[in-house]
Amino acid sequence: MLSCIICAVASAQARPFTYQEMLLLDRISGLSVDATGHYALFNVRATDMEKNKGVSALWLKDLSEPTTPERKLGVSEGGARDAQWSPDGQTIYFLSSRGEGGTAQVWKTDVSGAKAEQVTRLPLDVGAYRIAPDTKSLVVSLAVFPECTGDEIACTVKKQAERAVDKSSGEVYTKVFVRHWDTWADGTRNHLFRIAIDGSGAQPVALTPGYDGDVPSKPFGGNEDFFITPDSRSVYFSGREAGTTEPWSTNFDIYSVPIGGGPFTNLTAENKAWDASPRVSPDGKTLAYKAMKRPGFEADRFEIKLRDVAGKVATLAADWDRSVDDFAWSRDGKSLFVVAGDVGRTRLFKIDVSTGTVTALSKDGHIDAFHETPGGFVFLKSALNSPSQLYLSKPGGVIDMDPINLTAVNAKLKDLAFGAYEQFQFKGWNEETVHGFVVKPAGYVEGKKYPVAFLIHGGPQGSFGDGWSYRWNPQSYAGAGYAVVMIDFHGSTGYGQAFCDAISQHWGDRPLEDLQKGWAYALKTYPFLDGDRAAALGASYGGFMVNWIAGNWKAPWKCLVSHDGVFDARSMGFTTEEMWFEEWEQGGSVFTDPAKYDAFNPMLQAKDWSVPMLVIHSDLDYRIGVEQGIGAFTALQAKGVPSAFLRFPDENHWVLKPQNSMKWHKTVFGWLDTYIGAH
């Protein structure tokens, strides 16, 4: 059954969109709107292929004049990111490394954006920051050594200087994490500090002294991990202090601390699962935060908790079976605006604080960021046929129903052809409804058959939905002449928690059944799919599934692409960094339950591999170590299976550098063209 209206496609005369054009697109992010709703700030990242990096700039849009072009702020020339408005809307703060010493510091400018003035002059990089509502201070994060007492900053600078002159490169570790994501531990922790900016000359105040945890959390945390109260008297933050059990723990808690320093208080000690993203209501009377229920399970449902001034905690919309991604208080404090995955889309919802009533405010696509204004919403939204764009909603109703496009960024896309797409559904494992998307090739001709790229998402608790990606983008395949099929198998997010839970300890059976049934349904329903010319591709869990398919479902595939996939499940159980993930997903440790790791271990079936496979892995991938890719490639070579190994020495679990991404796509499409050739 079809569950989505077929999306429009550019005219047949338009040139197909290609991966080369995708990698050169300007990328919008970082939405910030002033308190009056007059101006919107956003970041645009251009790609400099010669320098092999992205170059970011701040842009300003006057929301009162939607048809007037946005303008680039002059201060961007020195490098500018993470812009925030002062509460009065007169000053723009941002991070830049333009000053003496090259450290990242907070700077400011006025609305003209012509001249930058340095605000902080710290000897350490500022990692994240917030402006106190009274504008007398900032709260910033700095990487310091937690064992430092007294002046943490000076002590850290001294220890770093001592390390710099040490001619030995050896590092002794006495606990894990020894490395995380793509970085080896150096003994520092992200800590919060109050920095006076009122001219008083007050020294920085440590807000988390001695805390053996990171605020913001590593590796991806930002200023969403802490919040300053409207009266500028307190700071709430989320952190995890777990000692030697840190890699096994998801027990993040919400703390409060006076902004002037003093003891910090754990407000969520009773919950041993994940508490995150503190947000205080405009009247300062209610703390909202996200919370999970099950310790050790990172993909549990995030629900909203409300804590009043008396310490009473209630769950908001307890029966709403969606997991909260981002959220913010409404201007009047009567509602929370929530972003959550929902059946292949990432939508904005409003939840009434008094009743828990949930109302959908967007209809499709992927809401990337939003901000409520007096007249509606400013938001960033992407889709399967559009990168993130800045929009202004019309008053009332659904925000993405005929919104106003506020920028001319990537205007050339209107002249390119994209593949039309639609969502479908079928009965998968346990006769439960499973959804997927099919994308036609750009320039599709009725009656013609096309080779198929069968894309398998990672996570595994993730989704290949109606949103844009610069790494796994189905439109890059459509532009190269391939049709695309993507299945949100059991374990995917946005379909309820039970659906998400179904994959744990079942990596190789329930999702595989969904993929097999989804493939059969797609072939039966869409005659333009050429089932005799098909390839399966995936990354992370998708890479695991490709390795698993190589020994369990070979028939449909002329070739395979495995990016950062698990090859040996037992080895993965010891070499990955976030142990809570492995032990939850496998149902125990390698010590206690080795048979569970072997139940879906691709290595044990490598003797049966025969389908040509391209293996891709990177040296800085500490989530799924490069040895997994080397192992898969070695097995293929030992069996005499046509194979290739693409290695990046300077990438992590994701391939991000422009030239490397270009190489990735060129290699992958060369592999596909060899075996199922769209050209």
Tell me the role of every PLM-derived stretch.
Residues 35-36, 87-88, 133-134, 230-231, ...:
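Residue-level detector of Asp-centered blade-edge/turn motifs that repeat once per structural unit
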Residues 40, 89-92, 138, 235, ...:
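Hydrophobic beta-strand positions that form the internal "hydrophobic ladder"
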Residues 44-57, 73-81, 95-107, 121-127, ...:
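A flexible loop/linker signature enriched in serine peptidases of the S9 family
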Residues 63-66, 110-114, 197-200, 258-262, ...:
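Short loop/turn segments that connect beta-strands within beta-propeller blades
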Residues 448-458:
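Short beta-strand element of the alpha/beta-hydrolase
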Residues 473, 478-479, 486-679:
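Active-site-proximal cap/loop segments of hydrolase catalytic domains
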